[in-house]
């Protein structure tokens, strides 16, 4: 089961739908309806922190869950606000980066983590005004946009991954493949799409 932390964002349900299409059992809880301790002892094989309209400091258990997953060595994927929460937890700065609502960018990656087996570059859809800047040493930047911003990173040693853009957007290429890679990181089977 994948436990999805919903940061009160409609994009959460698109992510859930994609995960379910790939064969995952998914449980969704709001960011203020569970503690990080309850989350990591829920039996979930992996965790996804959703996008949301606020900052990591205002995102319920999101920051605390990053730490709990890190302590337990559990797989975690952060999308947009979730990505920012991972970056901030490990010592990065979350700063204003210009309004990018529904804009596409070419994103280039190194083929690691959730980007394994994907062509580079591809189109990613961005819905954000904040970005992670000054990425800490614990995280490896593995994806950048054509305008030079960090679009993805992975932890050097832990199964923790973040993407700034939205894999669940219809305008993002290879969204299902990125989420399938995350399910594999979680040790879960992946259903082939027709």
Language model: regions and residue ranges:
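Phosphate-binding/catalytic loops
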Residues: 5, 121, 162-173
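Catalytic beta-strand/loop cores that center a nucleophilic Ser/Cys/Thr
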Residues: 111-157
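Two-component/phosphorelay signaling modules centered on CheY-like receiver
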Residues: 17-25
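Acyltransferase
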Residues: 170-194
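Cysteine-nucleophile active-site neighborhood
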Residues: 41-116, 123, 179-180
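Short hydrophobic/Thr-rich beta-strand motif most characteristic of the beta2 strand and flanking loop
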Residues: 25-31
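Extreme N-terminal starter segment of soluble prokaryotic enzymes
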Residues: 1-3
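Active-site-adjacent helical/loop segments in soluble small-molecule enzymes
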Residues: 12
């Amino acid at each position: 089961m994948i436990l999805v932390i919903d940061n009160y964002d409609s994009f959460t349900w698109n992510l859930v739908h994609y995960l379910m299409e790939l064969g995952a059992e998914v449980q969704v809880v709001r960011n203020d309806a569970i503690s990080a301790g309850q989350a990591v002892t829920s039996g979930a094989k992996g965790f996804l922190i959703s996008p949301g309209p606020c900052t990591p400091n205002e995102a319920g258990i999101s920051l605390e869950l990053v730490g709990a997953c890190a302590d337990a060595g559990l797989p975690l994927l952060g999308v947009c606000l979730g990505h920012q929460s991972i970056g901030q937890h490990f010592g990065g700065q979350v700063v204003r980066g210009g309004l990018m609502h529904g804009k596409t960018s070419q994103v280039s990656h190194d083929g690691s983590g959730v980007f394994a087996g994907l062509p580079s570059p591809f189109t990613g859809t961005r819905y954000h005004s904040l970005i992670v800047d000054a990425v800490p040493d614990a995280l490896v930047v593995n994806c950048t946009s054509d305008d030079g911003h960090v679009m993805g990173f992975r932890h050097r040693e832990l199964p923790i991954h973040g993407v700034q853009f939205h894999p669940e957007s219809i305008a993002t290429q290879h969204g299902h493949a990125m989420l399938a890679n995350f399910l594999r990181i979680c040790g879960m089977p992946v259903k082939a799409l027709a």
